[in-house]
Amino acid sequence: MEHEVAWKKYDEVDLEALEGLASNYIDFISENKTERRCAATAIRMAEKAGYISLADAVREGRALSAGDKVWAHSHGKALILVQLGSKPLSKGMNILGAHIDSPRLDLKQNPLYESNGFALLDTHYYGGIKNYQWVTLPLAMHGVIAKKDGTVVDINVGDDEGDPVFCVSDLLIHLASQQMDKKGNKIVEGEDLDILIGNRPISLKGEGAEGECANEGDEGAKDKDAAKEPVKAFALKLLADKYGIEEADFLSAEIEMVPAGRARELGFDRSMVIGYGQDDRVCAYTSLIAQLETPADLAKTAVTVLVDKEEIGSVGATGMASNFFENTIAEIMELAGEGGMLPLRRALSASSMLSSDVSAGFDPAYASVFEPKNAAFLGRGLVFNKYTGARGKSGSNDASAEYVARVRRVMDDAGVSFQTAELGKVDAGGGGTIAYLPAKYGMDVIDSGVAVLSMHAPWEVTSKADIYEAYKGYLAFLKNA
């Protein structure tokens, strides 16, 4: 059974809506390259749509009822949006769940060093990457540095016009005979992914006015360090001048190195999007927009969960494995007059969820790892993965046949183009999502997202048609599941 290309059904109204959504999506992923930025932007968008802080509602003892809209965050890196429906929460919710973290290079806690006239930053890669894809690539620096006095400094270098960028260097082909004989996972080792940030030494006293340092007291010791590592010293001076930070402040920093530059339209026909972090911000954004556009006269409560740490196992306080989701729903039920452990358990088990995560798009350049009858194709709509996992579905959530049938009905009734797929051929590899975690409550969960080419590469590819169908499908699910 072959699914029709979604583009064929669009009229001018559809195309205008599709292009508008794609344009806003390109802006979103270009301007929000970290989980913190995604969460902060989503909160601003939610508040414009009438959402209020759950923390404020709890503090004020405000009762919640049908039509009320609240948001809650965890450490600024995970977010839950809830719009209450007319039915009791204990009758279940319709939930979308996506993640807003993406593979990247994180700075180590003690990252800065000088070597042979270069200042560099040591990194530890985050998530599953092919190390060799990250060399000679313009990189931007995003994140925060928390100082001992309690202030938090935002770092954003490399994406504004006129900003410098950074990179990991590579070995010239003329001397790479041994390197080229290595396996792909050894061509560039993780410890070699160090960021080149400077080559200019500081000017010490007596050597020139710029970058001058004093020679008394503690400053004298700093001068000795600067004389020993002048390029590192100049980098530190620039950081101190711009951000008011010192080297020790890296100990309490979260700084991510990500591909520099905006997402772009791809192809002569502009039918695709190429950009960083589309796994899984393409599903996060479409889920967010669907949640914000959910109509006021909702029967079942609509929920969108945007979580962190999926790429490393959904662990920690901001991952789906934490109690953030459960605790937030408990707080809302208390304010809605449905407090208590038993109503909470009933609400969770009676809920339905789409785990909004991307799927591997069929790539004709690598056709051998796909089984075409059960592969996702760009341009054919929203993808449903009944199960994921690897090696005999290990680690997957396997949605029930009855739930798949119900989701099919919702999509068909809304005119949503969709397809079903596995990640690839049996035993070719595999992967997982957050789906198995909410499923532990007994709720129905199925993976549902957008097909992606070059997944986990610095630049990933999606189809505008699939982005549009994902938005339509997520909205239909929140309204009618």
Stretches with model-predicted labels:
Residues M1-A481:
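N-terminal hydrophobic/helix-forming segments and targeting peptides
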